[in-house]
Amino acid sequence: MTLPSAASSHHRADAFYRRWQRLNDWLAQHREFWQPAPFADPSPAWTKNWPALADRVARLSDSDCVQWDDDPVALAEWVAGALPSFREFGELTGIQPLAVEFADQNTLPEVRATDMPGRKRLQAGAFASAIQPLKHNVLDWCCGKGHLARTLAPLCGGDVTGFEWNATLVDDGNRLAGKFGDAVTLQCQDVMAENLTMPPDAHGVALHACGDLHRRLMRKVAGEGLPRVSVSPCCYHLTEALDYQPLSRRVRASKNGLELTRNELRLAVRETVTAPKRVREQTRRISRWRLGFDGLQRQLRGVDAYLPVPSHPTRLTNGDFATFCRWAAGNRGLELPGDTDFGVWERHGERRRQEVRRHELVRHLFRRPLELWVVLDYSMFLEEQGYNVRLGTFCERQLTPRNLLIDAEKRSVDC
């Protein structure tokens, strides 16, 4: 959803708000599909309220699940066969790409992309292309080793600075910049520090800064009236606040606005399209074990309720189900009977994994709507602070599902 540059700030802000309101109402209408977590709730309410849809979902094959996961719009159309309100999905979530015609030539050559994973190199190149031209000094926010900063340096006529709190990454990044002759300076800086000083005339950029970090950048840029900010947000749930705190006045004033918890925000970033096959297989195995143990603990406790188990030690990943169960039981203070049939419970876990996989297909349809709900709030905030905002995608979903870009330029006085 990009808006023409000629559109007035008033019309842009109104368009963002109308889009946000539609998403808000649609999400509220469909709470039963996205609020319960199938992993913890074997029988979410929607499976009883919409039995025709539940039956269709239960009959999906594994290959169907893979196909639908890769095409949310087509999945929504399929779900609409049982629940017509899902036909709005495509219109609600459609968003235009920002200009990325020269992504290849703006990407760091592989020979200069030391310590830079291939996908990150391509993401940085696409991001750089989408924010051309660069007219100001650039500040790479939470820059790590400065991969984005080094990508932008040849395209920028001004200074390129990076802020990063990890001193080791700063040292490594400055060595890389020196090795390849990049006009980049990284500084060891906690961006959440109260006394943070921003470089003058800075264009703040952030590629996949998390939660409070990207929110801090937008507030800091707006508060100091800096000329531009370009953000691809990520991990919206990584905040100190337990519930989502809207940035824009219009969202805060809305009487029917959703009140999202951190856990609900986490749903927006639960996608694995970029995970290697080995990681996906490992995830399936651990899910089977956790769901198998969940069935076992419900029987042992005589309580039909999910019992959270913390992250397991890495050493267990390549072990077996019985070892995992003994660790989980010990962690939760449960005693496993000596005659526990682990084979029965592992098979139970696989049945539940298949069920969860299908129920999550429906729940995952709400990832993009939730993400857009948040990003539209950010966009309205920046419009309210005197910026012209472009909102769109900077790359294809297959490169990264976190492909939204907010690009905001300070309005001139006569606008």
Q: Where in the sequence are the language-model features?
A:
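Conserved SAM-binding loop
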Residues: 173-174
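Conserved SAM-binding loop of SAM-dependent methyltransferases across substrates and taxa
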Residues: 145-157
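Class I S-adenosyl-L-methionine
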Residues: 2-52, 192, 198-415
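Conserved SAM-binding motif I beta-strand of class I
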Residues: 159-164
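Class I SAM-dependent methyltransferase "Motif I" SAM/SAH-binding loop
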Residues: 118, 142-146
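Conserved Class I S-adenosyl-L-methionine-dependent methyltransferase catalytic core
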Residues: 41-132
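Conserved class I S-adenosyl-L-methionine
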Residues: 136-142
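Conserved SAM-binding strand-loop segment of SAM-dependent methyltransferases
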Residues: 181-191
